[in-house]
C-alpha cells in the first residue's frame, strides 16, 4: 500500500498516512501493476470513463463505464492499461478496515461475493452515490485535523461498505 500511496498522495493527500488513500479521477501510472502483484489493501474503484483490462487471480476482466472493481488483499492483480480512463475510489489498509464498525455477519456474504466476482456493473444512481461518498470523504480528509476526523472517516467507510453490500 505504501507504493500505491506514493503514486496517489501527490494529488489526493488524506492526512491518514498509508491507511486511507483516495484514488482521484485519473488512475496513477499503472506501471506498478504491470506484473502480477498483491496490494495489501481493500481497493474499491469505479470506472467513470474509458476502459481498463486487469487480471485478478489469473482471470481477465474488462472494466468499463459504471463498473466497480473491488480488490481484496489476498488477490493477485495485474493491470493492462488501455487508453484514456477516469476512475474514482479508495484504498483502505487492513488495519483501517478492521477498526471500522462493520458487523462481520453482514460482511462475510459480501466478502464471499467479491471473491467470486470482484467486478460488477452499477446503475447511474449507484455510481453517483459511490462518487458522493468518496467526495465527502475527500473533503473531510482535506480539513484540519480534529479529534474525531479518523472516526468520521471510519464510519463513512462503514456506510460505504454497507451501500456496496446492498448494491451487489
Predicted regions mapped to residue ranges:
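Generic protein-terminus/edge-of-domain signal
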Residues: 1-62
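A hydrophobic/aromatic-rich effector-binding and dimerization subdomain
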Residues: 7-13, 80-143
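Jelly-roll (double-stranded beta-helix
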Residues: 32-35, 119, 147
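Short beta-strand His + acidic residue motifs that chelate non-heme Fe in jelly-roll/DSBH
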Residues: 53-55, 71, 76-82
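Short, surface-exposed beta-strand-loop junctions and turns on beta-sheet-rich folds
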Residues: 60-62, 69, 86, 96
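Conserved metal-binding segment of the jelly-roll/cupin
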Residues: 63-76, 91
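An amphipathic alpha-helical interaction segment
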Residues: 125-168
